[in-house]
Amino acid sequence: MKIFRDSLLVAAAAMLIAAPAAAERDPAYAAARAAGKVGEKVDGYLGIVGAATPELQRIVDDINIKRRAVYARKAQENNATIEQYAMTAGCQAIARTAVGEKYQAPDGSWKTRTSAPPERDPRCP
């Protein structure tokens, strides 16, 4: 049953990434991501790498609020907690990072994606 639930979470999380996509098309967000100022966290949310400016904090907060709303809806639809669903989404977002983008490693440090697979949390499905 756990494997089935995890499979459902993975499938559902794959669909959710498009949900906050409009906010993530913001040129300021794209510039921050390309500059390594923001990165994907294993908890499913966007994080600030280094010093935060008010504008960068606003962008990250806006995206994370939208992500949380999607996670809440999808978690309820899939009989999971928001945290379970968000982590599954975070694992997938980290797996999809492009070379040069930042992500949070399992130890909490920020890494820059290389051509090798990213370090993933052992709890990732």
Feature-to-residue mapping (PLM):
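N-terminal secretory signal peptides that target proteins for export/translocation
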Residues: 1-3
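Bacterial N-terminal signal peptides
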Residues: 7-16
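Surface-exposed patches in mature extracellular/periplasmic domains of secreted proteins
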Residues: 59, 71-89
